[in-house]
Amino acid sequence: MKFIVKLFPEIMMKSRPVRNRFSKILQGNIRNVLTRHDEQVKVILEWDKIIVRTENESAENKANLILLLSSTPGIAHFLEVTESVYTDLHDVYEQTLAMVGDSLDGKTFCVRIKRIGKHDFSSIDAERYVGGGLNQHTDTLGVKLKGPEITINLEINNEKLFFIDKKHPGLGGFPLGTQESVLSLISGGFDSGVSSYKLIKRGSRVHYCFFNLGGGAHEIGVKQVAYQLWNRFGSSHRVKFISIPFEPVVAEILEKVENGQMGVVLKRMMMRAATLMAERLGVEALITGEALGQVSSQTLRNLSVIDKVSDMLILRPLIATDKQDIVDCARVIGTAEISETIPEYCGVISQRPTVKAVMRKIEKQEEKFDLSLIEQVVNQAPTIDIRDIAKAVHKEILEVESVSQFAENEIVLDIRSLDEAEESPLDIEGVTIEHLPFFKLSNQFETLPQDKIYLLYCARGVMSKLQALYLKESGFDNVKVYRP
């Protein structure tokens, strides 16, 4: 099995040294991601492309590699190819006839050939020879150079012949690690997830900082969003997840700050804490999901007042983005369904929030605040490697049992997304398997027959453990985790 990976055009426009550096980083990222699924994968860097090879030809492995390549930043598109050798142009024609002849019946077609190396024929010569032969020896409706129903793409590279079976779109952007690291203030909502994704796509390693205002269930949901982003788009690099216990700060604000100023003061306290954490991590900037005018605290005046509390660069990738566009993007990247299940936890709700904060008034309110509390909660914040989320969950809920065998009255509940389940179906002989995506569990699990025991399944066992914890905390004891 072979894939030809094409680099994002902005990479190709860079100077030679920069292009070389970006290409090598992308090669390493692809290798890191793919070899965890297939140890036989070889990743070879050429001047304008990256070759991915593997001896594992299984349909499941192919689907996994396609999914991973399509989610790796820095790739414009990649080609799924079949490789062979040839002797002459007639051999190229005969191999092409064997590959695509039956599919041309009743269809118009054209042949496109890219040629690399020294040959006694040109690319146009090859296209005419192969196309003419197919036109004469199949039941096609004829050659159509513009707008054909079928385009046959071949590549002749010296003595090798490549049939391009399918072209897959890539994610675009820059390879992860080509830009400086950043810290995302993630809440679990639509906005912070999408803003984090945009920086990942642009080549930054994104660490996650969560201000816990809503207890354990809220944190679990936010971990799901962060893990989804890392697992799908950024798993070539290690990142941190930090949960800052912000309840004491909220309590202090509720007690000492005027109602109308609470929202801006809370955001300033978050920026203070995030700046401290970012400095400890050695990152270059903070990211938020704020969009201009979306809520009362997100006016230009308020954002300016909020930013003055930190000397660190604060990035807002969504500042001029409509809410519906943000939600649509969240659905594409797979975080929307999780965000929809996360309640809005806000310990500070102003009845009449200010939309034009005055620095003098805000500073007057903050004089009442014990700012040492910020450093205290930052010092208390647990920092974990996002890959260890599964282990952290295991420590939190030892009562959630993981099983690999089945007993009577047990049903395997596949909680993967529909696309993932279709790409790699779970089929266990003699066992009842039902599908309920993880983002529907909170609302629909209670509608299932509760006299059954449900074994939650996902590919890596992380989301299933997180969901098992959520269901246990919600009072459901009839859940386990299935790990084959």
From Swiss-Prot:
Catalytic activity: [ThiI sulfur-carrier protein]-S-sulfanyl-L-cysteine + a uridine in tRNA + 2 reduced [2Fe-2S]-[ferredoxin] + ATP + H(+) = [ThiI sulfur-carrier protein]-L-cysteine + a 4-thiouridine in tRNA + 2 oxidized [2Fe-2S]-[ferredoxin] + AMP + diphosphate; [ThiS sulfur-carrier protein]-C-terminal Gly-Gly-AMP + S-sulfanyl-L-cysteinyl-[cysteine desulfurase] + AH2 = [ThiS sulfur-carrier protein]-C-terminal-Gly-aminoethanethioate + L-cysteinyl-[cysteine desulfurase] + A + AMP + 2 H(+)
Domain Rhodanese: 406-484
Lineage summary: Bacteria, Pseudomonadati, Pseudomonadota, Gammaproteobacteria, Alteromonadales
Protein name (record): tRNA sulfurtransferase
PROSITE patterns the UniProt entry points to: RHODANESE_3, THUMP
Residue span, THUMP domain: 63-167
Residue positions of the active site: 458 (cysteine persulfide intermediate)
Free-text function comment from the UniProt entry: Catalyzes the ATP-dependent transfer of a sulfur to tRNA to produce 4-thiouridine in position 8 of tRNAs, which functions as a near-UV photosensor. Also catalyzes the transfer of sulfur to the sulfur carrier protein ThiS, forming ThiS-thiocarboxylate. This is a step in the synthesis of thiazole, in the thiamine biosynthesis pathway. The sulfur is donated as persulfide by IscS.
InterPro entries: Rhodanese-like_dom (IPR001763), Rhodanese-like_dom_sf (IPR036873), Rossmann-like_a/b/a_fold (IPR014729), ThiI_AANH (IPR020536), ThiI_fer (IPR054173), ThiI_N (IPR049961), THII_Thiazole_biosynth_dom (IPR026340), THUMP_dom (IPR004114)
Species per Swiss-Prot/TrEMBL record: Psychromonas ingrahamii (strain DSM 17664 / CCUG 51855 / 37)
UniProt KW keywords: ATP-binding, Cytoplasm, Disulfide bond, Nucleotide-binding, Redox-active center, RNA-binding, Thiamine biosynthesis, Transferase, tRNA-binding
One GO CC term, this protein: cytosol
